[in-house]
From Swiss-Prot:
Superkingdom of origin: Bacteria
InterPro entries per the UniProt record, alphabetical: MinE, MinE_sf
Protein name: Cell division topological specificity factor
Any matching Pfam family: MinE
NCBIfam families assigned to the protein according to its UniProt record, in alphabetical order: minE, PRK00296.1
Organism encoding this protein: Vibrio parahaemolyticus serotype O3:K6 (strain RIMD 2210633)
Keyword terms: Cell cycle, Cell division
Single biological process term from Gene Ontology: cell division
Protein family (similarity comment): Belongs to the MinE family.
Protein task: Prevents the cell division inhibition by proteins MinC and MinD at internal division sites while permitting inhibition at polar sites. This ensures cell division at the proper site by restricting the formation of a division septum at the midpoint of the long axis of the cell.
Cell division as UniProt keyword: yes
Length: 87
């Protein structure tokens, strides 16, 4: 390796540039689309049915959210406000 090659930046191949650009486009489209899966409303109803077997609960007191943290990580968060008294 000569001294000039050390200070000169390495040129990226057109294939690697195309791959990087495609990854950026795919990531943008994933974030723009509806990130929530289609089964979430049914999942929320099923969870409500199970909880209501044990506790009287208002369906408006259940909050189900879904979000993508990274390409590999998705978070499903369920918040249920339970009443003070049990069934």
């Amino acid at each position: 390796m000569s001294l000039l090659e050390f200070f000169r930046p390495q040129k990226k191949t057109s294939a690697s540039l195309a791959k990087e650009r495609l990854q950026i486009i795919v990531a943008e489209r994933r974030s723009q689309n509806d990130p929530a899966p289609s089964y979430l409303p049914q999942l929320k109803e099923d969870i409500l049915k199970v909880i209501s077997k044990y506790v009287d609960i208002d369906p408006n007191m259940v909050d189900l959210t879904f979000e993508h943290k990274d390409d590999d990580i998705s978070v499903l968060e369920l918040n249920v406000k339970l009443p003070d008294d049990e069934k």
